[in-house]
């Protein structure tokens, strides 16, 4: 049980004990350090702030340099927060969060941001059928069609599916099984796919179900 911040390396295939090829995703989960502990009496909620990776001090802003120095850790690439229940362990500022808290066969939830597709029409974004290909139609093949009534309701309903930005959404994939844990390399291998492109950051949290 636990949680950690990781970076998606990519997908591969590994063989299980039955010599079956299993599609897996490799996640580099470390090095992660606790940079701040937030409390209800001060910040209004309880959470651990965790950094990922190590980078040169001059690569981060002056305020963040002071923040990392106060915690006594090397500056990282990003900062995220985990609730006390998610990390499920007592940690002090400056302590390291490692992959050793995870076991093979354990189920985890992976949270990430999906790949951005840019501005997309309704056919690509929502799998609309488009207009008729005949009966004199010339420019309505990929159009959404009518989006609102006339006198009643005389408006477009909220949430009507239209063209817009596709992707770049927060996605959670639940109950992925851990296929392999490599503490010496800070790697976790999970079965199946996870959201986001390669080198994107993801949160790995033990599943409660």
Swiss-Prot record:
Region listing for Disordered, in residue ranges? 131-155
Its organism's taxonomic lineage begins at: Bacteria, Pseudomonadati, Chlorobiota, Chlorobiia, Chlorobiales
The record ties this protein, via InterPro entries, to: Ribosomal_uL3, Ribosomal_uL3_bac/org-type, Ribosomal_uL3_CS, Transl_B-barrel_sf
Which is an annotated GO molecular function term of this record?
rRNA binding
> Subunit structure of this entry?
Part of the 50S ribosomal subunit. Forms a cluster with proteins L14 and L19.
Q: Which family does it belong to?
A: Belongs to the universal ribosomal protein uL3 family.
Q: Disulphide bridges in this chain?
A: none
**Which NCBIfam families would you find in this protein's record?**
L3_bact
Which GO annotations describe the biological process of this protein?
translation
Q: Which PANTHER family match?
A: 50S RIBOSOMAL PROTEIN L3 (PTHR11229), LARGE RIBOSOMAL SUBUNIT PROTEIN UL3C (PTHR11229:SF16)
UniProt entry tagged with the keyword RNA-binding: yes
Database matches in SUPFAM superfamilies: Translation proteins
Q: What is this protein called?
A: Large ribosomal subunit protein uL3
């Amino acid at each position: 049980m636990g949680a950690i911040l990781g970076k998606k390396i990519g997908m591969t295939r590994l063989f299980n004990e039955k010599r079956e090829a299993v599609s897996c995703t490799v996640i580099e989960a470390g090095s992660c350090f606790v940079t701040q502990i937030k409390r209800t009496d001060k910040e209004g909620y309880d959470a651990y702030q965790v950094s990922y990776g190590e980078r040169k001090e001059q690569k981060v802003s002056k305020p963040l340099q002071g923040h990392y120095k106060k915690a006594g850790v090397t500056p990282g690439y990003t900062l995220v927060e985990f609730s006390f229940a998610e990390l499920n362990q007592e940690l002090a500022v400056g302590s390291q969060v490692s992959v050793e808290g995870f076991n093979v066969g354990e189920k985890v939830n992976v949270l990430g941001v999906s790949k951005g597709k840019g501005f997309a029409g309704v056919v690509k974004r929502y799998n609309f059928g488009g207009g008729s290909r005949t009966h004199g139609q010339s420019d309505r093949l990929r159009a959404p069609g009518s989006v609102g009534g006339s006198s009643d309701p005389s408006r477009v309903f909220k949430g009507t599916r239209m063209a817009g930005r596709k992707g770049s959404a927060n996605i959670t994939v639940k109950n992925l099984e851990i296929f392999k844990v490599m503490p010496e390399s800070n790697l976790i291998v999970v079965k199946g796919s996870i959201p986001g492109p390669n080198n994107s950051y993801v949160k790995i949290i033990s599943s409660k179900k």
